Structure formats: structure tokens, C-alpha cells
Regions:
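Short beta-strand-centered segment that lines the nucleotide-binding/catalytic pocket of NTP-utilizing
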Residues: 54-69
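Hydrophobic anchor at the beta1->P-loop junction of P-loop NTPases
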Residues: 31-33
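Conserved lysine of the Walker
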Residues: 41
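Conserved nucleotide-sensing/catalytic segment adjacent to the nucleotide-binding pocket
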Residues: 68-110
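Short phosphate-coordinating micro-motif centered on Lys-Gly-acidic
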Residues: 2-4, 95-151
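Walker A (P-loop) phosphate-binding loop of P-loop NTPases
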Residues: 38
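N-terminal pre-Walker A segment at the start of P-loop NTPase domains
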Residues: 1-20
Length: 151
């Protein structure tokens, strides 16, 4: 799997990467966000929401599991799978993952891995300092990597 990597020095720079992703990814894209607690997953989603002109406050939907933002340039489906496991993944999430007219961002994707499409884009976030992060974006689809190369 090929990848592109970035280093950000602040939450603002992490949100800017998300903003640019919103403009680079085609409809139906599924983005799996991988990283420890506090790694910047939700911060990146906030940037994506900003890039889609979504004005609502974006918070991790940990207890709701999913939040759908419809008031923007295109829909954003934000899933936090942390509280899920194989026994309780059959709650209809598959209807929203890869929503054809929008973007799907999934925090803690390893808990619903069997629901992820083959062409899922993986974004791995690693803290390297207080607000510094390494961001690695990978995909098996070379067209996706080409689209986000200039992010």
C-alpha cells in the first residue's frame, strides 16, 4: 500500500490537512482514522467539515456512535466505532459507510473492520509533541493518492 506523509505542528495545521482532504476526495470515500486517544482524529474531521462548509460544531460521536452532517456542500458521516465490537456492529452502519453523495470518516475503524470497503483510505495520526503530529495517508487506489498528493 502506497502512502503520503505530513508533519503538522499545531491543531490548525492538522485541520488544514482535513480541509484540503475535503476538496480532494471523491464522493463515496471512506476514511479510516487510526491513532491513540488525543492523536487528532476528531481535529482532522473538524478540518474536513470546514472544507465542506459545515458550520455545526464537530465533536467525536463516542456515545452516539454516528453523527451525520447534512448542511454543507455535501454530507459528512462521522462514525466513532470505539464502543462497537463484532457482536454489535449490525446496527445499520453499513448503510452509511461509503454514502455515495458524501464522505465517511471513521474513528477506531478496527472495531468494524469487516464493514470497511476494499478501497478504504487509511489516515494514521501519531503524536510527536504537544500539538505536533505525523499524518500518514495510505490507499490501495493510486487515483486516490494522486488526488490527495498536493494536500
Amino acid at each position: 500500500m502506497e502512502y503520503i506523509s505530513y508533519h503538522t505542528s499545531s491543531d490548525l495545521e492538522t485541520r488544514q490537512i482535513g480541509y484540503k482532504l475535503a476538496h480532494s476526495l471523491p464522493n463515496g470515500s471512506v476514511v479510516a482514522l487510526v491513532g491513540d486517544l488525543g492523536a487528532g482524529k476528531t481535529t482532522l474531521v473538524r478540518g474536513v467539515a470546514s472544507g465542506l462548509n459545515i458550520k455545526e460544531v464537530v465533536q467525536s460521536p463516542t456515545f452516539n456512535i454516528m453523527k451525520i452532517y447534512l448542511k454543507g456542500d455535501r454530507p459528512l458521516i462521522h462514525i466513532d466505532a470505539y464502543r462497537l465490537n463484532d457482536a454489535n456492529t449490525d446496527i445499520g452502519l453499513d448503510e452509511y459507510i461509503g454514502y455515495e453523495n458524501g464522505l465517511t470518516m471513521i474513528e477506531w475503524p478496527m472495531f468494524i473492520e469487516k464493514l470497511l470497503p476494499k478501497d478504504t483510505i487509511y489516515v494514521e495520526l501519531t503524536n510527536t509533541g504537544e500539538e505536533e503530529r505525523n499524518i500518514k495517508i495510505s490507499s490501495d487506489n493510486p487515483k486516490i493518492l494522486e488526488a490527495i498528493k498536493n494536500v
